[in-house]
Amino acid sequence: MNRGLYGKLAVNNIKHNRQFYLPYLLTGMLTVAFFYTMLYLNHNPGLDELPFGAMDVELVLGLGAVIIGFFSVIFLFYTNSFIMKRRKKELGIYNILGMEKRHLAKVIFLETFFSAVGAIGGGLVAGIAFSKLMCMLLYAMIGYHAEIVFYVSESGVVSTILLFAGIFMLTFIYNLFQIQLAKPVELLHGSSQGEREPKTKKLMAIVGIVTLAAGYYMAITVDNPVTAVLLFFVAVILVIIGTYFIFMAGSIAVLKFLRKRKSYYYKKKHFVAVSGLIYRMKQNAAGLASICILSTMVLVVISSTVSMYAGLDDELAARYQGDIGVSITSENPITEGDALRELVNRTIQQENRSIKDEQGMMTLTFSCISEDGNLVIRKHDDEGSYSSDIIMLRMITREDYEEAYNVTVPELSDHEVVLTTSDDYEKDTITVGDYTYPILQKQHFSSENGHWMDNQVYYMVVNSVEDMAPLYEAQKEIYGKNASSYYYSLYIDIDGNREEKIACGNAVSAAIGASGMEEGHDGKYYIMIENRAENEDSFRQMYGGFLFLGIFLGILFLMITVLIIFYKQISEGYEDKERFAIMEKVGMSNEEVKKTISAQIRMVFLLPIVTAALHVLAAFPMIRMILAVMNLNNGRLFAYCLLGTITVFTVIYLLVYKMTSRTYYRIVGRQIG
């Protein structure tokens, strides 16, 4: 066969199937452009000049490149499999007319090659052309001001070509197996396979319900941030499995139940819609579940990153309680704490800064094992101790507690304490080791007051530092070199602009270093110094990077969702065309056909977005606690961001549904619109 004929056939096939190939190539270009942009930004030399947070931003961008690369594989394989299914009849005709499968393989190879060149080449051109604009957006989000020099990332270009060339090669191998293993008759009927009525898979439906319920239960009942972080991915996997199983098995069971209801089923619009969905539900369900999962990812990623960025000031206020923070771990807290305070105050005065607010706090924190309501001081590796039984006991003086948390604590007599927990402590006394303390008052620690607390931490308020001494000695005797020391924290707000506050903080750090106090880190004491104004840039850059990545990934997931919806509408249209033509021949009018179509596509395409919204609402408590680990305790802000994201995404989803429905109508009937 003339070698030039293969190329002509490949080009003509792409042109003939442009309705399928154009969206495929366009989204392929965008995916390539996204991937290159992430690599370009990650290797941008300008980021190396960031005064703070360069590693954080580069880590976020590197993570984004990995995520985009991973989903590119899934996305391109999905769209390729759809196109191949629609084209099996065409390839079967070629086979019957005399083309051998090796000839078909050459044509498919050239089609894949041309598609790869178009997608990779077009994507790289777009990525390079808009790279400077993307860099400007990133710099704006992280609050970085620097000159942006246009350049092409050679390593980014090479990595992009290698990845996507590999993906397209894998799709070619997949297509080759599809052709080689199929008989000519199977190719002719390949695009209409899957019409057998699926069986009701009760076990799959039950497993789906159980896994989804388990995922929801974890998300809703999680009671502390640490557990939320540990169980998040477990809950996600359970929800994904449950979603797919319920869509694939539960939906069929529901449709068959509706078919048994004669009063519902034997109506024109219900009869056609329900019977049509039953015969193709296995195929539909996988696509609809994918749309649901992708929609959920869009909602979670965008709402979380937007709320993190919008709540940056709250997060900084929770993380840094003063412009300058100095803490010391010591065995002699009063003497060394007073010396540290005096040195810091003197240095601030030397820098000509005024102290606006000053707060000092002394605490002693050590771990215990909860046994029958008592706290036992014992090493955790002893037999019988479990992580769920570990309680972190934090002792604090009454005066410091009132000042730090803006609460009122009643006067305490000898050995009396106030116990603050986030769970229900029922006893009127608390026993720690060999010491029992009467509880004058119990308080609940609420997350709504701007501070989040793990329910495995107890705050025990005492009169003075001297009241901490017995338990300090007790835990020191048990834990030895691993025992806790007193922890003195000093937070000071000063006047001045950002640069003056940074300079003052650096002066405090230098003064402490020159005093020789830091040399006590051999176990006697250890000093840590924090400068809020200086660290604010690092946080802003990291969270700005997360926001940029969230928007980028949100657009990518949305694009994949739109393409799946588009291909599904086309697939549904071609599969329904003959069926509705038969209905028209037996007496159904165009108007009745249109109503039937509307009922079917509404049922099919509104289900994923409704389910996605339910997933996100169920995940709200868990995501909120995970954000609390990052000091975002403003639940109302996250709720507003989540509701806003759901609203905007729903509008976009409905617009896409409306536009793709027109394509469906045009395929099914010329007069339906």
Question: Where are the predicted features?
Answer:
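N-terminal Sec/SRP start-transfer signal
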Residues: M1-V32, E197-K202, T211, F247-S295, ...
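Short cytosolic juxtamembrane segments of multi-pass membrane proteins
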Residues: R3-K8, L181-E195, Y574-E575, Y665-G673
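Hydrophobic alpha-helical transmembrane segments of multi-pass inner-membrane transport and secretion
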Residues: Q19-G46, M55-G92, T112-A126, I206, ...
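Juxtamembrane interface at the cytosolic side of transmembrane helices
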Residues: Y78, R86, Q178, N224, ...
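Hydrophobic alpha-helical segments
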Residues: F114-L258
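Basic-flanked hydrophobic alpha-helices used for secretion and membrane insertion
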Residues: E315-T329, T335-M559
